[in-house]
Amino acid sequence: MYLLRANLEILSVKMCDGKFSEQTIAKMEQIVQRMATIEQLEQFDEVIENDNQFHACIIEECGLKRLYTLWSSMDSGNTIVFYRGAGKNEYVVHNQEKIHRRVLDAVKTGDVQVICKTLIDHYMETTIGYLKDHGISTEEFPYKINVNF
């Protein structure tokens, strides 16, 4: 489900041709700033909430309510990905702002290719880390995000 969410976000970026409103960018900026204030592992639920709100901005930009409904129906899968990363929770807490700043900076370019590539990298970083933690070769992993821009 995690990589399906990534593909839905990429679809939204393509549908809006990489053009995000000033309001959406401002909202994403506020979320990233909120991410920077989280310092304690006890705030892990806020980390997940911020992540969902940030990525929801990407999905909502194209204006298709059904796309958002489909994407948000996978929230539980995203939550599981966060909690399955046990042992890396502190890393996520302390790096969430930096990780999402890259995506926001890409969004600000308005360039579909840059945004989509950054989203792929964003989602694959987590996926590759999970595979390595479980002794699975990335070459054996059958699900790749191969997106033509």
How would you describe each model-predicted region?
Residues I25, E29, I48, Y68, ...:
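Conserved positions within tetratricopeptide repeat
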